[in-house]
Amino acid sequence: MKIGFIGCGNMASAMISGMLKKGLYKKDEIIVSNLTEEGSKRSREKLGVVTTLDNHEVVKNTKLVFLAVKPQFYEEVLNEVKGELTPEHTVVGIAPGKTLAWLEEKCGQPLKVVRMMPNTPAQVGEGMTGVCANEKVSAEELTQICEITDSFGRTEVVPERLMDAVSAVSGCSPAYVFMFIEAMADAAVAQGMPRKQAYQFAAQALLGSAKMVLETGMHPGELKDMVCSPAGTTIEGVRILEKNGFRSAVFEALQG
């Protein structure tokens, strides 16, 4: 079965790259639409997939359609292509705030609809994606969707009521992590370390720490305690972070 993308920006490109690397689809089984010939040329050169400037061609030639345009263009795109949609199609939205009910309504008929929230680390094959689907999507079809998202990271199926939480803890948080890496690097630079080297130390520390959480299954607090020696510099740093509201600031940012 062919797969289609309406829009082919950074996120769609990351998703397609993952699918191709894992061998889920061949290049000629993926069709993407772009607004401009320049965009189509870029997609062909970077990904080697079939390209078109016509969104209708994507829908007519595939049964699994990803909406990979910016959220403000969703309604316009669905109004454009809903005449070609059939009950055999599965429509996948990857934009925040577009609910399953909203997507189904804008499709103009009862359809198989999936909502997913990938994040920017998908661009390096380390994404985290939350997925939910309406009742028309079979377990087998949902498994197929998850195989796709697993090709560029990890996947969790969640009830739709948690998708806003997914957006916060997974979609927005990379920006906060980048700020933390930058702050750690700044501190190292202040002590004389070259900036490029400081970024390496800070980023690898976060990468390794994250892998410890995922691979050991231990509670993050327990892992933290393992690093904190009595009367040591690490526990003193923890004290300073707690004093300055580190946890509260993160909590409030994710609640916003």
Task: Mark where each language-model region is.
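Small-residue helix-packing motif on alpha-helices
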Residues: 30, 40, 58, 194-201, ...
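Internal alpha-helical scaffold of NAD(P)-dependent oxidoreductase catalytic cores
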Residues: 102-112, 128-165, 178-215
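A short glycine-threonine-serine/GTX helix/turn-capping micro-motif
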Residues: 166-175, 196, 224
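Rossmann-like NAD(P)(H) cofactor-binding subdomain of soluble oxidoreductases
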Residues: 37, 46-47, 55-60, 64-131, ...
